């Protein structure tokens, strides 16, 4: 029996400095050994395995580091796994006893750590834990050190968690007293541990009310401390406290006894009961939530951190419930949180924070984690009924916070549940519009965003809603303008803001859903906006400003639609901007303040529109437009700087008709100027070098000029409600951003520094963000600073050196002056802003690869030195990276910066300075890399090694981070650095300075193990080792071990584990699946289904996906563990996650063939087919994969479907849609391969059709779409499959009714245009399959198509009123209908009744087809593309069509239309040209995009060229092919059909066109499938044969290529290009023709393709002049020989290959020159060698037969030019007759070949020797009995011999008869069959009829026997 071994003896020989590493490695091995022992072995050797661990703690405790302590605990856990509870209890008692009365704190810590970890793992299995509780309690006293108390309290919390109910009251009191004393500690570690204990005690509800009240006050007190980990713990405790108070309250109410602190003191016996009542779960939850909400609004929660902690507590309370419980109690949650909100009109931060928190809870917590598809709709209904509608009735009862929250939550739910419109949505729309009309300014953004989300989901009311809002806005302005001038109107800003923003927002929805509106609605927007701005000049100030604001904002929405809308209005827009952004008026200083404010307000609104124009119309920026915009912006900048601030009262007053005060608007104006300049700088070829603008940015950044006008810092913070008081005034937002290497924590979400200030940015509502949230808008002051920094970084690169120097000097002076001042906050803001600016422009310099002058570098170093003095860890990464950029850009002296930094780092005594500099060293090494000399590199490496063990935490961590980032650069110069680097990393992990428990013994207050730092180091190391890990198994295994331990440490410390996951990801990239990877796999998949930790879940999904891509073994292991079920569940919770979909697709692609049953059943179930058979894979796989119980239960559930989570819910429509997509893919790919899985799909056809029917009849748009796509796939792939039970019946025949009904469902009133269009095309394809045999069977579908055609034609009166053909959808559906009818014409070739059905409409259809195809060509390829068109005009018919809509449907329909026109062109060309020459096209709306003056009657090839060019250009744009099946194949057929000699002559063989055609064909021949390749070959052949110089080429007589005429030579060159395409096509399939002879596809289509190519090659070769043709013949012969090596091809297409050889030989014989004869002899010789080599090789039988038949063909077809005296011919004949002796299988073939050769060659005198040899050899072998089947041979030989008489010259016929008749007479006796004898008789009679005398004389000379035989044959023939 193998036992685990932990050798401690060798530690005595190990030096102390190495003992830590040795112990750790030994424990790693020991843990593996323990894990591999079975349960019985571990139980029998329990004490034996335990003793070494006890000894290790006792003897070598001082060498046990923090990670070792955790590893030691894991050893105990592995030892105890699976053992009974009493064994585990007994073992743990050993550790308790081992430190009895011990004073050594190190040993105590080690034992406490082991016990804590073991109780965490096995606490639920150990019944009696009082001993452990008292043990931990003993070491929790406040008289002990922080380290001991922290671990002891952690252990105590584990015990309390599992055994609190069985612990007596006295002990609980003592524990609580101890906890209270520890709660007042100054150590964060101890405080967190004490809070964990308190949390579990509170869960037992065994504390008195007075204690609960004390604890609440304590929590409020501590919540003001700025520590995110502490906040999380406080939040959990608040949640537990509220639950305990709720239980107390419920119990007191049930007992009808008031519960007060005084009563508690007097009735302790009553309170201290040993049993706990069970309370109603809902009631307890309701009370607890109410308590938390009351605490949130209480006076104690006066800090933002206190409120954030309470929000976290509410969130924790939710997370502790079941998801279904929270959704069921959604009404209660709404009532408690929202309906009890107080009315607040304050603009303070806490008020905004309260709004933020409510929205966070409802949208981000409840909405994203607890609501499924059904409860989401219920949630909308509850919010509507309990918040929005009541608010509409009485605004005093519902707070605006509640309304905003309800709207934000509803918008979020709508964005996820899009796809189906319900009656509830209509009710919601009406309510929202009514709230809008209330004119509440504070609700404007939420209302606008909700309307946008709602109308995106339910687009049908878009048009009426837009018109209603326009009418209301016009009415409001009319009312405003109608007031008398003497009456000062009181402007309701809210109604105008609401209407304006809502219109802007809804227009975005209209642009995204253009089929539901008329194009004229967009023109209405522009014209209305233009009128408002123009007419404002005639109004009073208030009304004018209201109109200006609305006009510019609506124009901002208009220009955001892009160039297709903006281009034609650009001139008017530029005039508007010129007027609004004019030069600074000369009398600006004499203007009153109101006039100045009005001017500034006008400029601000115009700038917002300009910014929108810059963002969405970059393509329109010509040099002239750029110049104008720069002038506009410079005017605004000068205006901003032209006046100074005046009276305090004036600058803080709100500006009329605006949302801002003067100070706010001033900041926003400058911010917009910066934003516009920055957008301008991003244009290609644009550089800004305006020094005045640069100085303005510097003033804003380094002098904080934006704060001018504010008296105090407090006033700055309080001026806006969107910035936290924690934020330093004037500092950039990047200062508070999360570092790149860290992930945002939960508290970062709850306690933001900034809140979205959407009211300051009207552009936010037109953002094209895919997020459901209203886009984040930073507060105005913050936005100004950020924009200034961004613009400065972009501009500084383009400045001359002198300007750079002066600017840097200003910055240096600014930082230096503030350094010695007392304004610390201002100093910090300026230094941070300056640093971010430096970092930004250095990054820009780096991207541009520009060097820096010496003076600039020295100033930069001086500035960075000043910034280094700022003691803030947040700035360290930016400073160090700035140094790296600087070193890289200072290329004249690349190492001078590094040398300076190394020297300063070594000499500096300031820890912060050392940390910055050492990290800078790492980044410089990474950036400069090989540019650093080796000596400097070694110095830097040695310095890093020293600093990696520094006693200062900050320095050490920065140094280790520097080591990790520079590891790659160092290793390239010093490869030996990587040797044993894993051990070096381990040594850093085991440093005494990293042992947080021991460090806490030294009274340090707060320490946490930096597991993320070491994980990052390990990840860098793995990437550097790379493929070497495959060969170095020890290093790879050790890396796996370190990753596993770091994962455990990250879980313990709560660190971000992304880097640990990345370690695993990269390990699996370079190494095979580790045997001990189960823990990591379970960890990943547990995170994936855990919605309570969304960020960790997101990371886990990404890492899992990357590993699956890189490691197939890992992927297979996960799939066998049934993790696809988990992924489906996880996908249903976040259905838009692309990575989850990709994971499923990977598995579907890999296992759809081997596991087709499971996949089909799961996919069918997901799409709603519930009664499918079991979809579970065999449980035997679980046994084979050694899955533990936890993994199987996690992924697999039980074996019964009823208990499997996968089968217990209704899935979201997004999940169903993706499942339908997967099912469609599965069907298409499986049926294409026609393998065994296809038979299974055939057996499930009824379920597949039912799934398609269920989806296509759904009320959800996307499910309808998925259903029709699935139905189309089924029709396409199963239409040719016959029913297995009835061979003459199609498989789909029985489903005709279901399929037809699905089409009918698309035409209901609420169907969308897209669905109608899709159903029309699929219906036409269904008819085209021929499944509907008669017109009566197809009547239902044909009627639908006919109705659609009649409704869509423009000449039909009243088509506008059709329920589907209205607004712009009428054009969309018209093209879709034409496409469907075009498909009918294409299918009419196979479906007879369609010809008659089409005949009555064919002319009308043809004209519309031509219009549509011409319109498509103009839009897609014309000189003016879509971006050139105006999508919305108002005056002409031409401009009433939105080209985006047309192009969208054209791209899905044009190919069908092109096919139909091609068919008509070939069958009834006069019809097409008659239409083209008539006036039928002139009045059509579709044809407005195509105007020409071509006379098609006289230039008929022109329309061919039109069709050809449309197809050709479409092949160059992949997007035009996506909507079709086999698009390239169909296009090539069209191009081949329309190809004429005239088209080739005038167009295709043009010098400019031909190369493009060839390039495209080369690309396609390499990438398309075999069928498409074949169509390309046919096209190439036809193109070659249509060469204009065809006749001149073939009959060109020349001895040299160089002597050809130029036209002929040019044509030869072009033809060679086509021949190259054919050769390339052959190389794709024939391995022997390419340098890499890899195997190619061997299916029948591929074989047919080779034959087609070879035949085309021969046909094209025959066009060339003779001198070239011969070379091509040689090439063809070589190709033929290579093809013969392909056994599979010969098996499929041998006869076709021989036919091709026949064609080649015939052509060569026809040419009849010496070279051709030589080539034929060479070929014959090669064939003979092949025949001899393969004659005994059974594997090459096909090749042998082909070679034999080829030689026969050569001797047969080339006989006129061959000489039979050649030795090679004689050798072949010998082989032929040799085969007659033994080849029984091929005897008949060989015999026929002999007779054929004899007959054919008898015609040619040069081959007479061959005939003589055949006769001689035949007679000899027959006489000797050597022929295997002599009777059969004679039956063929004698008639052939007698037939030769006809071809024998007259002078030799007598001698021939003298030979042939005796031979016939002698051997005819062997002929047994009467028919054969009769045939011989016929031949003899024919001879006797020609030469009777000679024949009779010869017969008389025969022997009696021979004579008798001849007579019998003749008599038999006569009879």
UniProtKB/Swiss-Prot annotation:
Disulfide bonds: none annotated. One of its GO terms (biological process) is endocytosis. It is found in: Cytoplasm; Cytoplasmic vesicle; Nucleus; Golgi apparatus. HEAT repeats lie at residues 106-145, 166-204, 378-416, 457-497, 783-820, 854-892, 894-930, 935-972, 1265-1301, 1336-1378, 1526-1552, 1553-1589, 1674-1714, 1722-1760, 1767-1806, 1832-1869. The modification Phosphothreonine is found at residue 48. Keywords: Cytoplasm, Cytoplasmic vesicle, Endocytosis, Golgi apparatus, Nucleus, Phosphoprotein, Repeat. This is Pof6 interactor protein 1. It comes from Schizosaccharomyces pombe (strain 972 / ATCC 24843) (Fission yeast). The lineage of its organism: Eukaryota, Fungi, Dikarya, Ascomycota, Taphrinomycotina.
